[in-house]
Amino acid sequence: PWLIDGKMMSEAGVNTIRLYKSSDNHNGLKKAIGDFYEKYGIRTALGHWLGFWEYPQPFYADPEFRERIKKEVLEMVKTYKDEKGILFWILGNENNYSFSGRVNPWVCPEADKAEVSEQANIRAKIYYSFVNEIAREIHKIDPNHPVVLGNGELGYLDVAAKFCPDIDIVGILIYRGKTFGNIFNGLKSIFDKPLLLVEFGADSYNSFKKAEDEEMQSFFLEAQWKEIYKNSGFAKDGAGNCLGGFIFEWSDEWWKHNSDNSLNWKVHDTEAGWSQGAYYFDNKAEKNLNMNEEWFGIVGISEDKENGVNKRLPRKAYYMLKKMWESSSSK
């Protein structure tokens, strides 16, 4: 299936994809990375969640946990560092949301003994110091590919600036609707590293109208991408620190709303999972729930198959981005 996707991506002007994690099938993944690069000129950013989505929750204060995760990451780097298609490594995703207990809270004796107001910063110090250890080790075995810190918004990056200086790029996950707001200059003021938007986007389902809305998705993605250009090193009037971004996402994920029930994976669920008022086309939906995890693709998926693979259905956003990227590459 990656050959089908790779061809469509190449035709649209995609130059890099993000893989959130490695695979146990090393040869299969190497072939996919190689095919994307050799056939379509598309590079790969390969990541590791650093145990964030494991069960039980991650335990970044535990030496055994840290050693196991570090070993996994370094094995990944050793395995894939010589693949021509590799562009860089991404460490973590939105792990900083665990510091306050918002997502996947973890036990930390040092933090638990401290004042409540200091606990999150102590966890941040422990986590970012751990990421820095890994980044240093990666640079020793692979000096050719940058290391990216994956972080939810700007949260705790003032702590990262002190304890994680060896990362090369700050990767931001952000969902703020039409504009990224202060993200570019905000990063400059607290952690002056190049910025990469490692996850952003807009879904294509209008929860208020209860219908697919390609116009809505295309509107937000166009505005977002224009801000990326404005704040790149090539522009004159922006922050000049943005390297680019990874749109979330290429194709819809039908399994995501109820991932524990495999029978539901064949159903394209339209129930929104969370709320973000900045996506204002449908923020008046019931309970303001307007973010639909199964509808973020710029390419839809059909139940019909062609050569054993579900047909890809490009949305308006796909063609809008194709036109925008073609215009940019010609300048």
Regions found by a protein language model. Name each.
Residues 1-174, 179-180, 188-190:
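Active-site mouth of glycoside hydrolases
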Residues 9, 14-20, 44-49, 147-151, ...:
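Long, contiguous hydrophobic alpha-helical segments, chiefly transmembrane helices and signal peptides
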Residues 11-13, 79-85, 130-145, 227-242, ...:
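A structural motif corresponding to the C-terminal end of an alpha-helix
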Residues 30, 66-73, 131, 184, ...:
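Amphipathic alpha-helical segments in well-structured domains
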Residues 52-58, 100-101, 110-113, 191-232, ...:
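Active-site clefts of carbohydrate-active enzymes
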Residues 63, 121, 211, 308-311:
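Alpha-solenoid helical-repeat scaffolds
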Residues 163, 238, 290:
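Short, conserved catalytic or adaptor-binding loops enriched in Gly and charged residues
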Residues 241, 248-331:
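Aromatic-rich peripheral "rim/lid" segments of glycoside hydrolase catalytic domains that contact
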